[in-house]
Design a protein with these regions (language model features):
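An N-terminal assembly and electron-transfer interface module characteristic of large anaerobic redox
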Residues: 15-16, 139, 143-149, 388, ...
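Short glycine-rich, Thr/Ser-proximal phosphate-binding strand/loop in the N-terminal lobe
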Residues: 23-65, 135-136, 140, 354-394, ...
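Glycine-rich phosphate-binding loops at beta-strand->alpha-helix junctions
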Residues: 84, 219-252, 272-276, 411-414, ...
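Conserved phosphate-binding/catalytic loops in two-lobed NTP-binding clefts
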Residues: 97-100, 246-281, 425-431, 581-600, ...
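Adenine-nucleotide phosphate-binding core of ATP-dependent small-molecule kinases
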Residues: 185-216, 520-549
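Acidic, glycine/GT-rich loop-and beta-edge segments that sit at the periphery of enzyme/chaperone cores
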Residues: 286-349, 457, 608-675
């Protein structure tokens, strides 16, 4: 035996040769510590699994201490692994082995027939393929689709993880929910809750989101086939998750008793009992090759020493220098108070405001002189209807006999549900409600910042009206739920967590990034010894930075103005309020009812409407009606058109009902106003007519074309070309969720835009139609419309066929034609296409035809495309004329040609139509301007040049508004949005952006559109 010492003379191990000893594997993940100890016969004699709540070293020491009696006086070898294990290994001198290697060791020893391992941890996820050599794919900094994601979803539904699992097993329907990170998923789940969707269905949908994230985000286009071994805590503890994986991957689940037996055939799902400890077991197996041995006392000493060590992390200034400064701060902000009146002594008229927000429900009732009689603030607990019902009963009880509720208004995500359920008199969009509340406290307010549970709303006020609105997109990092999630993950209440940051001496500089990126920063800070207070203060600063630099995008604090009102429940946190004031270097107003401002604004609005409409009593349900109130919901599919949209039917007392999830008015029994022009609908009908046009050639070759990206607008061109050559053309079906799902297994990256993801489904759709020849050209250039410095297509639109060919195994036996064409030069295109066609003839794929026929077909193709542009311009001009003659709002709904696809736009055009708006598209608006605007950016993309021209078009018309659809993952739109915004704002026009992806819930989009219409209507 040789004792090993470092340069300082400290002991860090013993060196033994060929001695039988115990082996310990320590797997320290992002949220848990797992330890397995093997005896000399490789039998498990100790295993443990526990959450470390970011106290990594202390928890590891604690769990090993529990094994003291088992280890006894035996020597032991140690291997550490896991995403958070390297720091422990380094400070203690233990051997560290990468977790993929140790997992492979475990698989080879216990499950050699395994083709693929799927392991989900707390914040880590990975797939290991064993066929064709070892290949591993891990998540990056995003914790979507992991245990942490499931924890966040349980918190949102206000159920335990065990209850979430049980709920999922009773599901009848799967909703589409994002899983790339928790804050996106919250944006999808909360509207479902507010619309009355069943928790059982939502629970199963959460697990399905994890499955989808694994397939698209981790597998990255590689097929998951054969015998699949599922490891990690989430897959062990959640039966519902195992069920979703098994069904989606079409596997046969092995009974637990067979999980340890050799498998002769593939296609099995293996869920071993050792799943939570599997990586630690692999580490213990790997420890056999180590030459370093330890006694229990050695291990305990090294771990205890590492607990007290800290590293180098960046710090910011303290929020408060001392308690005196904090007391001055509290005194100043305590002055901004709403008046109150004792409801027990008050008699007369009252006005009720309800704010059914994304995560909380707020209620305020005011007197005739705007004093608060009653208020309520609490979490939705996943069921806003029950909460509002209980509170309305309480309000009716307090008012009985002496107070008359003259009027009531509601706002927030649950506005329509609550209004229909309880006969609330008025609905008001959130932005206007918050503006009215802020004006009450400061009539001269020129900037309002509201940070709620999932929303950041910023309003610039000019001439006593909202001049500009800025909202966060689907990501809610930096909002109240952002802080709440961190607090809960560390074992603190929100109040305890925030209070800890007030007196923090060394706030950690965590930057301003999304939640899942921030998780890594927090873990690193804790690993380096940062206190909870330091992290709390650092997160408060991050919330502020996110609002200032990601949502508002300020360059200088002076842009915010002098009279700033902050509100929203998040600003009740003194640490965040202080961080905001320090960041902008000025004092702001935070009303004492900061978290109730939406409800207070509703009450003010209700009072205004009562006066203007001379209302003497609200139509809100009476006490008797509230006592008899009942509510049930059922999810179904609307059968009134081919889309078969998923809708939720809420049924209330007295045979009343409310339908949510609908994208048009048909389920409500209202016939759509077909007279209002909608160019999205017009374009789609035109494309459908093209698909059904042209001569059919029985017995001749059929060429397939996927309907998406660059083929959408160019379908008239290609359809005409192939038809006139004498070849049948088969276009893939119009996009649908089902079409997306049949191709999702080959999508190489979850960050690509949804229109590109759909192309995988379109190819599979054509293959399913037994098409053996598919034509999908690469196109660097678009038609030259003479509106930009060049006429490029974006790289995804131009070259996606290359990716499909490389990534889709189904194309191996298909003649997949992806030539490079430039349609902007007719002569060059004619030469290139005839060359391409002759090559296909020479290969025996097409029959030979006279080249004159080909050239004639090309001439007709260009004429067909010209006709398409002429028809679209004429329809745009008709729509503009209609809007003017009927005093209608004209919306230029800007995007890409493929945004007319209903699966991509999710019916946003119909939603705008339902508000009485006339819809035209960016190509028509662009063609109607006489001179193009000057841009600061290089204007070289055809589709994007249309956006700039459309912004100029809107700027010159009083009745026109600009709404831009942006697909998540579109890098170029990061530039176009800023440029379009600048063109509009310098002409005092609003810029409205709606981000869209595979999620089809329009709750947030509706709020944004209503805000835009309300504000532009007041100007």
């Amino acid at each position: 035996m040789v004792m090993l010492l470092n340069k300082s003379g400290d002991f860090f191990g013993r060196l033994y040769i060929n001695k039988m000893i115990y082996k310990m594997g320590i797997d320290i993940g992002s949220t848990t510590v797992k330890i397995v100890i093997l005896d000399e016969n490789d039998e498990i004699i100790y295993k443990c699994y526990d959450r470390h709540l970011s106290q990594v070293r202390a928890k590891t020491a604690e769990l090993i201490e529990l094994a003291e009696n088992i280890i006894g006086d035996n020597e032991i070898k140690i291997t550490v692994t896991g995403s958070a294990g390297q720091g422990v290994a380094q400070t203690c001198g233990f051997e560290f082995v990468q977790e993929v290697f140790v997992t492979g060791e475990m698989v080879k020893k216990y499950y050699p027939e395994t083709d693929c391992v799927i392991e989900l941890g707390g914040e880590d996820a990975k797939i290991i393929f064993f066929n064709g050599g070892l290949e591993e794919r891990m998540n990056g900094s995003c914790a979507g689709g992991t245990g942490a994601f499931i924890d966040q979803m349980s918190l949102l539904l206000d159920v335990s993880n065990e209850e979430l699992d049980k709920l999922s097993l009773k599901a009848e329907k799967i909703h589409t929910i994002a899983s790339r990170c928790g804050v996106f998923a919250k944006s999808d789940i909360q509207p479902l809750l507010n619309q009355g969707a069943k928790k059982e269905n939502i629970a199963a949908s959460i697990f399905q989101a994890v499955v989808d994230q694994t397939i698209t985000g981790l597998a990255q286009g590689r097929d998951i086939t054969g015998n699949i071994l599922f490891l990690g805590g989430p897959l062990y503890f959640f039966e519902g998750l195992r069920k979703r994986f098994t069904e989606t991957l079409k596997l046969s689940e092995l009974p637990p008793s067979l999980s340890d037996t050799p498998l002769e055939e593939g296609g099995y799902a293996i869920f071993p009992e050792i799943a939570p400890y599997a990586v630690a077991l692999g580490a213990a197996i790997s420890a056999d090759s180590s030459n370093f041995l330890y006694k229990y006392d050695d291990i305990a000493a090294l771990l205890n020493k590492s607990v007290s060590m800290s590293g180098n992390i960046r710090h910011g200034e303290p929020l408060f220098k001392n308690e005196e400064e904090y007391n001055e701060f509290k005194t100043r902000h305590s002055k901004e108070k709403a008046g109150e009146t004792d409801i027990d002594t008050y008699g007369g008229g009252a006005y009720l405001g309800i704010d059914c927000g994304s995560t909380t429900t707020k209620i305020v009732m005011i007197s005739e002189d705007y004093k608060i009689l009653y208020n309520y603030y609490a979490a939705n607990a996943g069921n806003p209807v029950d909460i509002v019902l209980a509170q309305l009963k309480r309000v009716r009880e307090l008012c009985a006999g002496k107070i008359t509720i003259k009027s009531a208004a509601v706002t927030g995500y649950g506005e329509e549900l609550i209004r229909n359920a309880f006969s609330i008199d008025f609905g008001i969009v959130e932005t206007i409600a918050h503006f009215k509340a802020a004006k009450y406290f400061n009539p001269n307010v020129n900037f309002i910042l509201d940070i709620g549970g999932q929303d950041i709303k910023c309003f610039k006020i000019k001439n006593n009206a909202i001049d500009n609105i800025m909202l966060n997109e689907a990501c809610s990092s930096g909002c109240g739920s952002f802080i709440e999630s961190f607090a809960k993950s560390m074992g603190y209440t929100v109040e305890e967590f925030c209070k800890a940051g007030i007196y923090a001496e060394n706030p950690v500089d965590l930057g301003s990034r999304c939640t899942v990126f921030m998780n890594s920063s927090v873990k690193q800070a804790q690993k380096e010894g940062a206190s909870i207070g330091d992290i709390s203060a650092g997160l408060s600063m991050s919330v502020v930075k996110n609002a200032l630099y990601k949502v508002i995008r300020i360059h200088d604090a002076s842009e915010l103005g002098e009279n700033i009102v902050v509100q929203g429940g998040t600003f009740l946190n003194d640490a965040i309020l202080r961080a905001f004031e320090k960041a902008i270097e000025r004092e702001v107003i935070r009303p004492n009812i900061s978290g109730l401002m939406g409800a207070f604004g509703c009450a003010v609005y209700a009072r205004e409407k009562s006066t203007t409409q001379n209302l003497q009593e609200s139509a809100i349900l009476s006490a008797d009606e509230l006592n008899a109130f009942s509510h049930s919901s059922q999810t179904t599919n609307c059968g009134l058109c081919a889309n078969k949209c998923s809708i939720t039917v809420n049924k209330f007392s007295n045979n009343k009902r409310f339908i949510s999830g609908n994208k048009c008015e048909r389920p409500l029994g209202i016939r759509e106003n077909e007279k209002i022009p909608n160019m999205y609908h017009f374009k789609l009908d035109y494309i459908k007519s093209v698909i059904n046009s042209g001569q059919k050639y029985p017995g001749r070759k059929t060429v397939g074309m996927p309907l998406g990206l660059n083929t959408y607008e160019m379908l008239p061109f290609w359809h005409s070309l192939w038809s006139n050559i004498g070849i049948n053309i088969q276009v893939s079906d119009i996009s649908s969720r089902e079409l997306y799902q049949i191709g999702q297994h080959s999508i190489p990256s979850d960050t690509i835009c949804y229109p590109a993801k759909l192309m995988h489904g379109h190819i599979e759709n054509l293959i399913g139609k037994n098409i053996t020849d598919i034509f999908y050209p690469c196109m660097t250039y678009n038609f030259d419309e003479k509106i930009s410095d060049n006429h490029y297509n974006c790289p995804v639109v131009a070259y996606y066929p290359e990716l499909l060919q490389s990534n889709m195994s189904g194309l191996q036996n298909i003649n997949f034609m992806m030539p490079y064409f430039d349609v902007s030069n007719k002569r060059a295109f004619t030469k290139k296409f005839t060359q391409f066609f002759n090559e296909q003839v020479a290969a025996g794929r097409f029959d030979a035809i006279h080249m004159k026929t080909v050239k004639t077909a090309i001439d007709k193709a260009y004429k067909s495309q010209d006709l398409y542009f002429e028809v679209m311009l004429a329809e745009g001009e008709r729509a503009v004329k209609f809007a003017g003659e009927n005093n209608s709002r004209l919306i230029v709904l800007c995007g890409r040609p493929y945004h007319i696809d209903p699966e991509i736009n999710h019916g946003i055009d119909k939603m705008l139509n339902s508000f009485g708006c006339v819809i035209i598209t960016e190509d028509a608006a662009s063609a109607m301007i006489k001179s193009k605007p000057k841009t600061k950016v290089l204007n070289q993309w055809t589709y994007h040049a249309r956006l700039y021209n459309s912004a100029e078009f809107v700027s010159k018309r009083e009745n026109a508004e600009f709404v831009q659809l942006v697909s998540f993952g579109c890098g170029i739109d990061a530039i176009t949005t800023d440029e379009a915004r600048e063109i509009l704002e310098k002409n005092s026009k609003l810029y409205t952006q709606i981000k869209i992806d595979e999620i089809n819930n329009l709750g947030a989009a509706k709020i944004r559109v209503r805000s835009m219409l309300a504000v532009s209507g007041e100007k």
